[in-house]
């Protein structure tokens, strides 16, 4: 089965509104065709509405970096999936290691978010990944499989076929370290095998799996050549327009 690549930036808590607007203006007319690749930027919620307006008519898609699992209520400071979708946003990132570590999000929280995001009409980008300690102990497969099983609990086969899973080894995020292409592909293969165990081969062949962790323009082509890697979730290299476009150059 042919899976369309998806290259997604994750700005985290960076940029001002004017900087975000300038970025969209710089990239929107220079992106490869969406027939070849999905080009996505994950931005702080404050910027999503003006970015959605500016990107009209372009190939750029947008992701929120988080959402809550309720669509309304007394949840001060949270953003609902329904409100995010109403802005025209296509994707919502959930389960990032920074959310798990700093905001104590659990697998159960992340699973509830996945269900709410699908119900609202967006697509989750579900993150998973292990610490250096887990990696060095040889327990990566066990850890990542557990995160995937918990994150997908109760989702339908159709939903899982359409979502995106991002494998990000925590020890390679923002550290300058990166897993070898072989390690990245092997662990993305573990993710795919876990999906196959839960939902069957047809679903596992449909789900798109990204690698994330210090991905750069000079390393992305080797990663994308691997069998189980369908895209990248990119932090630092997505912050500048030139660098983001360089990540997509192979698809032009």
From Swiss-Prot:
Substrate binds at residues 10-12, 174, 214, 235-236. Keywords: Cytoplasm, Gluconeogenesis, Glycolysis, Isomerase. It comes from the Bacteria. Transmembrane segments: none annotated. GO terms for cellular component: cytosol. Its EC number is 5.3.1.1. Pfam families: TIM. Involved in the gluconeogenesis. Catalyzes stereospecifically the conversion of dihydroxyacetone phosphate (DHAP) to D-glyceraldehyde-3-phosphate (G3P). This is Triosephosphate isomerase. The gene is tpiA.
């Amino acid at each position: 089965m042919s899976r369309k690549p998806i290259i997604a930036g994750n700005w985290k808590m960076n940029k001002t509104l004017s900087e975000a607007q300038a970025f969209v203006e710089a990239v929107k007319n220079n992106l490869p065709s969406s027939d070849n690749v999905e080009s996505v930027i994950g931005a702080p919620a404050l910027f999503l509405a003006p970015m959605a307006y500016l990107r009209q008519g372009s190939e750029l898609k947008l992701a929120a970096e988080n959402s809550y699992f309720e669509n309304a209520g007394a949840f001060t400071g949270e953003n609902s999936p329904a409100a995010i979708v109403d802005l025209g946003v296509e994707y919502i990132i959930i389960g990032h290691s920074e959310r798990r570590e700093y905001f104590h999000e659990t697998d159960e929280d992340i699973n509830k978010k996945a269900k709410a995001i699908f119900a609202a009409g967006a697509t989750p980008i579900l993150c998973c990944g292990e610490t250096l300690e887990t990696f060095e102990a040889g327990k990566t497969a066990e850890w990542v499989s557990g995160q995937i099983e918990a994150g997908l609990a109760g989702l339908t086969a159709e939903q899982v076929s359409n979502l995106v899973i991002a494998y990000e080894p925590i020890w390679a995020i923002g550290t300058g370290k990166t897993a070898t292409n072989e390690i990245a592909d092997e662990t993305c293969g573990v993710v795919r095998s876990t999906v196959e165990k839960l939902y069957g081969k047809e679903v596992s062949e449909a789900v798109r799996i990204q690698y994330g962790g210090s991905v750069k323009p000079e390393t992305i082509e080797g990663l994308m050549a691997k069998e189980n890697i369908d895209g990248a979730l990119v932090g630092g290299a997505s912050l500048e327009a030139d660098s983001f476009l360089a990540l997509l150059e192979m698809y032009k």
